[in-house]
Amino acid sequence: MSAPLTWHDVIGNEKEQPYFLDTLAYVAKERQAGKTIYPPQQDVFNAFRYTELADIKVVILGQDPYHGPNQAHGLSFSVQPGIPAPPSLVNMYKELASDIPDFQHPNHGCLISWAKQGVLLLNTVLTVERGNAHSHANLGWETFTDKVIAAINEHRSGVVFLLWGSHAQKKGYFIDANKHHVLKAPHPSPLSAHRGFFGCQHFSKANTLLEKQGIAPINWTPELPQ
């Protein structure tokens, strides 16, 4: 048996590409200029730290990190422990409460326990300037995260992709639906959740799809890290 492929194996080369180096250099320069950039530098790649390629069961695509103080920590939709759940995550909890019978509504918004179970919480853009949504769009992060999704598509099978809103759906358009499971719904933000995110039952559907493959389901009740 060969060892399972790692992130390093499939996207390690990206770190040497000019677009990637340019992106990192731009972000570093902004930080050096005194701008507040989220998430903190050590958290930018947390999605890959918590969820190795071989362990992915579910992918939840976000857009760019939260741009308020102490929120973003490198996982889409998740906030640092002790920070109230933002509106989109509140709506995710509402859907979970109606979808998963034993869901326990948490008093926090930290989704590290999902990531550790194999839910890749991936934003398509990995940094943002404080108070300025989408300020780091089109720097090069999208190229990198396209490569990440392509690597999952190619090297894994049976992964459940949850694509909420047009941004995530465009990003995931090339995922092979014969090889993976692609579930689509409107975004959970208060602007669009009532258009079909509520009632989509993606969390229970994801678990059913995993169990059909003999894979342990996700415990969707977020637990704080010990």
Curated annotation (Swiss-Prot):
Pfam families: UDG (PF03167)
GO molecular function: uracil DNA N-glycosylase activity
Reactions the enzyme catalyzes: Hydrolyzes single-stranded DNA or mismatched double-stranded DNA and polynucleotides, releasing free uracil
CDD domains, sorted: UDG-F1-like
Primary location class: cytoplasm
Active site: 64
Function noted in UniProt: Excises uracil residues from the DNA which can arise as a result of misincorporation of dUMP residues by DNA polymerase or due to deamination of cytosine.
Name of protein: Uracil-DNA glycosylase
Organism field: Photorhabdus laumondii subsp. laumondii (strain DSM 15139 / CIP 105565 / TT01)
Biological classification of the source: Bacteria, Pseudomonadati, Pseudomonadota, Gammaproteobacteria, Enterobacterales
Record gene name: ung
